[in-house]
Amino acid sequence: RMSFDELRENGLGPGELLTVAQDIIDGGVDVISALGGSIDSDARLTRMIPIMGMASAPHLELIGEIKQKLNVPVMHAGKIADVPTARYAIEAGILDLVGMTRALIADPYLPTKIANKTEDQIRPCVGASMCIDGIYTAGAAFCIHNPSTGRELELPQTIDAAKAKRNVAVVGGGPAGLEAARTLAEKGHTVTLFEANDSLGGQINIAIRSPRRRDLQGITDWRTQELKRLGVAVKLNSYVDASDLSEAGFDAIVVATGGMPKALEIPGGNHVLESWDVLSGAKRITGDVLIYDDHGGTQALDLAENLAQSGANVELVTPERNMSVDVGGMVASAYFKSLAALGVKFTILRELKRIEKNSDGTFTAYLGMEDEAWEESRIVNGIVAETGTTAISDVYDELVSLSSNGGEVEIEALIHGGPQTSIRNPDGKFQVFRIGDAISSRGIHSAILDAARVCRGI
């Protein structure tokens, strides 16, 4: 396996590397796995293994030219994430073999589904790169929306049918609710999903407003298609409360109602715009903007990039010692490269202490370090905060006392995918569980993992 263009200043190019390749082939190598780029930094690695927001299959033309000059089969991997692109590369004679590493991490049954002519059921790779970054942050190549990858021993890729069919309600159509409904339907249960809004996807619908993260739509689209295939009754524009659910004859209710932006509880916090409103376009802001990130995910990075691209002068502030502490190296490097080019200023180790509104309509933001009395200030046209979410748990809270399990999740069963059999209230007519951000502020992967673990036990 070797690169045929290091794509860097003073790096080796196709001519030199073809000579190296020919020497290797003369030494007895039977197949060449040809790549583009180099791997000596996170940023350069994203050129070899492009991530979300970057072009698909960017090196096909280069590798096609290389193939014509070699007398052994040539394989290539480089964000060839879908079957049509792979098929084209083979049929057009550009490649002899296609490497689809991340696509197989997302769906190990991809080859089987091609053979069975069920390509429409392939779980798509969305390029989030949780798999690659996860090797270094979590010690395993997890997939953002396949919770079984990396956990096959306790959470197999296949879902066993339930011994007895049940009538189950899922409340909420975000990532957690969609995965819950899919898992329950795969087990053979009768499933009804209630979503208060007019579309499925939850917070993904906000995230995809950033051009860099549009591929996340694949998480929603695949599950929506699977729910249709599996016969799940999806009810949009359907707000349901505890009384609606408790009297509907369900055997189990899974609450996946998500969360709402967490309020910034500081003096003058009412002057802060919520990140969701700005990302969704509901609120517009220009001029000098301070973004306060006390969450550490990609949300503040999306905010900074979008606002800076629209002409705002942006300062991104975090109380942490590093920016975006929960974002992996490959993803972070792509954002930081863009933000640096846009002139975004980065400030670490600063808490947003208080805010004052000035007579001219601007705001003074007072920053300081944790437990320190001194302050420094910024005068800006607007302040946006990203602080995670607060669980929306009203429906769950009201159902707990009516349920047979008292809302309890058996931890050992959760870990190993066993049945949830806890009985705390013998008079209860149904079980109730909550998953995803309805428990606490986390992310897409955690929400889907919750759903997979809990619902396999129902």
Where are these regions (language model features)?
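Generic beta-strand/beta-sheet core signal
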Residues: R1-S3, A34-G37, A77, A92, ...
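Flavin-dependent oxidoreductase catalytic cores
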Residues: R1-V171, P175, E179-E186, T190-V191, ...
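A structural motif corresponding to the C-terminal end of an alpha-helix
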Residues: D26-D30, E65-P73, R223-K235, L342-K345, ...
